């Protein structure tokens, strides 16, 4: 593969059995996509990962751009329709279809990537950028990223499943207004399950479940590990049953979150 540009969004602890058990080791594996004489955009770094990327880029003479340093996104906010509004250096206000908090860092990365592609000859107009941000789901088929399922009670799903993704989800949940939080949670067996569960809000009512894939951890085991993290709830053998229970228990002013695994979200979306 000979790309015109490479992008590495961020580094988090995931797939550690394949990528390594430190951020530096994972970054080294991810840096393998950096190609000779090809610009690369790095979305987010840590003190551990930044020198890894810089060294690899220097070895293959790849121009490297750190999106956090270019900082083409000035700030973001949510409008009344739940769309995220980005104040940007190059395009003033951009309306984004994806409302998830993690999209702020992603957008900053995208803006750096767009500028590079334009500089190497891609005919990307402002109208293209606005259309892409405003209609990313319909244009790409993307689903399950802080996706609103229903109102009263408000139900949202998100496929974030590692500590990096869950950190954004927990922060965004803390920004919501609700009477009671209900969380439908299932996980697969190759993640940092205890680490993720320890991050979740203890005041929520939990519905532990199992996605319809072989890698899914049993609902009983999720419940056991969650109990060690101070989380309480009942178990349900399928995502559909867990969601029905949450809906039955929730009042109109409550909030239902469905996540923990891409496969849990997939089971939800396939049942709609």
Cite the ranges covered by each PLM segment.
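Flexible, gly/pro- and Lys/Arg-enriched active-site loops
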Residues: 11-20, 133, 144, 210-225, ...
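C-terminal helical cap/extension that packs against the catalytic core
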Residues: 46-65, 154-157, 163, 194-255
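Nucleotide phosphate-binding/pyrophosphate-handling subdomain across enzymes
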Residues: 1-7, 11-15, 25, 90-205
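Short glycine-/acidic-enriched loop or helix-start segments at secondary-structure transitions
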Residues: 17-18, 51-53, 76, 166-167, ...
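Acidic, Mg2+-coordinating active-site environments of NTP-dependent enzymes
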Residues: 3, 7-87, 107, 111-127
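Active-site-proximal loop/hinge segments that shape catalytic or ion-binding/gating pockets
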Residues: 261
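Active-site catalytic pocket residues across diverse enzymes, especially alpha/beta-hydrolases
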Residues: 117-121, 173, 226, 250, ...
């Amino acid at each position: 593969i000979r790309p015109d540009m490479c992008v590495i969004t961020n580094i988090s602890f995931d797939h550690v059995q394949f990528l390594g058990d430190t951020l530096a080791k994972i970054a080294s594996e991810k840096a393998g996509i950096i190609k000779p004489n090809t610009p690369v955009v790095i979305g987010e770094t840590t003190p551990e990962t930044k020198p890894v990327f810089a060294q690899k880029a220097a070895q293959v003479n790849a121009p490297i751009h750190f999106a956090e340093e270019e900082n083409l996104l000035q700030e973001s906010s949510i409008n009344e329709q739940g769309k995220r509004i980005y104040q940007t250096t190059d395009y003033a206000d951009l309306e984004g279809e994806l409302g998830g908090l993690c999209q702020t860092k992603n957008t900053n990365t995208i803006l750096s990537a767009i500028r590079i592609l334009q500089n190497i000859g891609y005919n990307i107009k402002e109208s293209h950028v606005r259309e892409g941000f405003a209609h990313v789901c319909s244009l790409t088929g993307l689903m399950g990223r802080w996706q609103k399922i229903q109102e009263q009670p408000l139900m949202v799903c998100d496929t974030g499943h590692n500590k990096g993704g869950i950190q954004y989800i927990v922060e965004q949940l803390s920004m919501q207004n609700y009477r009671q939080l209900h969380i439908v949670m299932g996980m697969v067996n190759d993640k940092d399950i205890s680490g993720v569960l320890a991050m979740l809000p203890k005041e929520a009512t939990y519905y532990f479940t199992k996605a319809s894939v072989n890698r899914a951890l049993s609902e009983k085991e999720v419940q056991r590990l969650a109990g060690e993290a101070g989380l309480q709830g009942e178990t349900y053998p399928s995502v559909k049953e867990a969601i029905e229970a949450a809906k039955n228990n929730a009042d109109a002013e409550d909030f239902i979150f469905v996540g923990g695994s891409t496969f849990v979200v997939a089971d939800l979306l396939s049942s709609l």
